[in-house]
Amino acid sequence: MRVIRAAAALNSSCAASSRQGARYASLACRTALTSSPLAPCYSARLSGLRYFTKTHAPRAASAAEAALKQAKELAAANMTPEAAAARMTPEEAKRLSMVRNIGIAAHIDSGKTTVSERILFYTGRTKAIHEVRGRDGVGAKMDSMELERERGITIQSAATFADWKKVENGVEETYHFNLIDTPGHIDFTIEVERAMRVLDGAVMVLCAVSGVQSQTITVDRQMKRYNVPRISFVNKMDRMGSNPFKAVEMINSKLKIPAAAVQIPIGSEKEFEGVVDLIHMRAIRNDGLRGINVRVSNTIPENLKELAEQKRQELIEKLADVDDEIAEMFLEEKTPTPEQIKAAIRRATIGLKFTPVLMGSALADKSVQPMLDAVCDYLPNPGNVDNMALDRSKKEEPVKLLPYDSLPFVGLAFKLEENPYGQLTYIRVYQGTLKKGQYLFNARNDKKVRIPRIVRMHSNEMEDVNEIGAGEICAVFGVECASGDTFTDGRLPYGMSSMFVPDSVMSLSIKPKRSSDADAFSKAMNRFMREDPTFRLHVDEESEETIISGMGELHLDIYVERLRREYKVDCETGKPRVAYRETISKRAEYDFLLKRQSGGPGDYARVVGWIEPNVENAEGNKFETKVVGGNIPDKYLAACGKGFEEACIKGPLLGHKVIGAHMVVTDGATHVTDSSDYAFNLATQMAFRKAFPDAGGAVLEPLMKTTITAPAEFQGNILMLMNKRGSIVDTEVGADEFTMIAECSLNAMFGFSTHLRAATQGKGEFSMEFSHYAPAPPHLQKELVAQYEKELEAKRSK
């Protein structure tokens, strides 16, 4: 206590004779005040004045340094999980246990947004239901963008919050949901990616007719990437051809995650009226306007009793494979109670070993409420999930974040959005409390920012709040940052890993039709790039054209349309361009001498070595030096590496990126006055370009995993279409429709939607997802290279 008193006293007094002492004391007091109860510190400050005056400053400096060390140790002790748990009030523990951060994700048109609308209605968040393509023209609440309502698709993920009152054994508990509705189209996959990065659980929606589809597999991959537990909801049970058990089989076989139904349907297709709960063996139906009332009966329809017993046994057997407690009971031939089954499902789901499958029809207002109960029962609260940060003071050692309000603040900015009131930054609070007016530090650049306003989002509406606790999701105004930035209150040297951002696969040139729109065009482009990491822009040095890149035709079309609507900028766009890559297939040696004299100091550099395929990583490049004897000094070798990187940005064949190349420098020569970093950088670039043709330089084209769904009667027409475009990988034929999966060159898919509409009378649909790069056919490569050389010649002749 005496050293803290010393520090406090010195901080209060005018310690002019020892600036070092004052500095230590100030730090000690600040640390003590932020990590200890305030009263003892104030007491120490008053008492310490009796011990120290200006004449004691040198002694105080030593005492203050000891005080700083002690205060830091005290602060560290207060930040341990045990100390934080001890300070947690029963109210905070209760609040945390009732929070569910969930997302709704699925294939296109599986009913994600319709499910979200029912969740909002049944939780009382909205007073009326508006359909995605409803006749009232209002559109779904979660599709707030005009383009979304016109096209009937979700383009941006939308966040909201709601309270769900769950009744169990006559006791009502209120759960708090933070809900994010995500797009289904692959072009907007970054929206799903960043949602999964910050969510604790998800509802994976499947179509009862189609089951697991192409985008379902993509969503599954994203959930696994971020270790997100999920429950599965088989939607559209009232459709003709619905088969929930086929969907369960497909989850097991295609997604490779153990799954079992926890419900079976009462009635099928148009006769679907509810579900049988296999855990409690009871029937659940919906009554009243929009299915607002849930009617539970302990009497199961007679014709379903045998099926219910069979599916319940299958559920227990599947749980025995993934849960030790149920496995032990199964071996002892004991029947688990409903409580034991629910506990096992929760353990296995949170442990990423299992997904329970529920079923219903959101559009028909049936069996959505039991799915909400399942979210409460089986998906984790923020305290059940291991969210990790990287401690930058310990070489980015992983450290677990704890969702306690009393700990230092750590949050992740996962989405940026332009708003009439300024930039809106969505933040997931992992640890600590975020308060209005609080100062935070951006871990990426150590910039200090103030939080002037905190809101909770309800699609495009907002509600102001003064503070947000640990485990919650909110949005803030007035914070300049990038998507994926970590924020702390300055007491912890933590950063967090960002989300995965896929490479763009398509580009096109764009320019405003009117020169007067240049400022608005530039403003829009900066905003779009800030909001969407998959939307990129660059200016081609040779053509001086502005090139935008994205995930597909629809992705870029949407941004061109938003330019017109939101910024009143009409644009001219060029033909879509494929993002080709260049590579090499064999080893080639080089010995290149750069020797230029222009009156003054010249350029001299010689580099010797070879280039070869990068066998370690076909998607990346590698530079290596094996120079002996100091023929090239180290300072120039670094310039050689930089030159190789720059040469790979724009390949010799088409001007596209080079991948899969390994360059080795073994020897070289320098000149006393004419050698420089610039000379060796340029010599390396020229050596690489000269050796590229000898190394079997080739063009790689992107292959797309293409999924086509259409009525079975058009199967022959689509086979003819796809035989011209790519190799067919798989075909699934159902009662009324079929699905074809093929690998196609992106170049061959331009305008495919028009051909598909003609071949299927407008009844077919398709989606594309980048698969991998593969060598382009020789005739295409020859054509592309000739076209590129012709363009270069035309530019040189201008």
UniProtKB/Swiss-Prot annotation:
This protein's UniProt keywords: Elongation factor, GTP-binding, Mitochondrion, Nucleotide-binding, Protein biosynthesis, Transit peptide
InterPro entries: EFG_II (IPR041095), EFG_III (IPR009022), EFG_III/V (IPR035647), EFG_IV (IPR047872), EFG_V (IPR035649), EFG_V-like (IPR000640), EFTu-like_2 (IPR004161), G_TR_CS (IPR031157)
Domain called tr-type G: residue spans: 97-383
Functional pathway: Protein biosynthesis; polypeptide chain elongation
One example of a Gene Ontology biological process annotation: mitochondrial translational elongation
Protein location: Mitochondrion
Keyword Nucleotide-binding: yes
Binding site for GTP: 106-113, 181-185, 235-238
Range annotated as the organelle transit peptide: 1-24
GO cellular component terms, semicolon-separated: mitochondrion
GO MF annotations in UniProt: GTP binding; GTPase activity; translation elongation factor activity
Family in the record: Belongs to the TRAFAC class translation factor GTPase superfamily. Classic translation factor GTPase family. EF-G/EF-2 subfamily.
Stored NCBIfam families: EF-G, PRK12740.1-5, small_GTP
Function according to Swiss-Prot or TrEMBL: Mitochondrial GTPase that catalyzes the GTP-dependent ribosomal translocation step during translation elongation. During this step, the ribosome changes from the pre-translocational (PRE) to the post-translocational (POST) state as the newly formed A-site-bound peptidyl-tRNA and P-site-bound deacylated tRNA move to the P and E sites, respectively. Catalyzes the coordinated movement of the two tRNA molecules, the mRNA and conformational changes in the ribosome.
Protein name, per record: Elongation factor G, mitochondrial
Protein's organism: Chaetomium globosum (strain ATCC 6205 / CBS 148.51 / DSM 1962 / NBRC 6347 / NRRL 1970) (Soil fungus)
